[in-house]
Amino acid sequence: MNKQKLLIVGGGGMVGATAAYACALRSVIEEIVLIDRNEDLAWGQAADINDAMGIDRNVVVHTGNYSDINDDDIVVITAGAPQLPGQTRLELIDVNAKIMRDIVKNIMANGAKPY
């Protein structure tokens, strides 16, 4: 049986890192991979989560990329463009739709099979 793995696209951001931390605290998964276009930020979030977990932990948190995806993994997408001052959420739709299309294309190209 394969190890359960959660991949969080946008894992360097606040929503992705918080989701990763919550899953790590509850030990609901064995491996958490943070994927982010800002690799340094994702690495910092992974390091912070690992430090917060202490010595006695059952989960591994690290950074990775789309090639880490297998067909039995869980992928969560938390990526999106930040809202600029004065900008409405409706004005962000086109930008976030493009981001989502690019992410899904990368996920599918690396062997993910949607259910």
Predicted segments with their positions:
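Conserved glycine-rich cofactor-binding loop
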Residues: 12
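Conserved N-terminal Rossmann-fold NAD(P) cofactor-binding segment
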Residues: 31, 35-72
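Conserved NAD(P)H cofactor-binding loop of Rossmann-fold oxidoreductase domains
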Residues: 79-81
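Aromatic pocket-lining residues of Rossmann-like dinucleotide-binding sites
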Residues: 23
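N-terminal Rossmann-fold NAD(P) dinucleotide-binding loop
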Residues: 15-17
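Hydrophobic Val/Ile/Leu positions in short beta-strands of Rossmann-like dinucleotide-binding domains
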Residues: 8-9, 34
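Extreme N-terminal starter segment of soluble prokaryotic enzymes
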Residues: 2-6
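Rossmann-like NAD(P)(H) cofactor-binding subdomain of soluble oxidoreductases
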Residues: 89-115
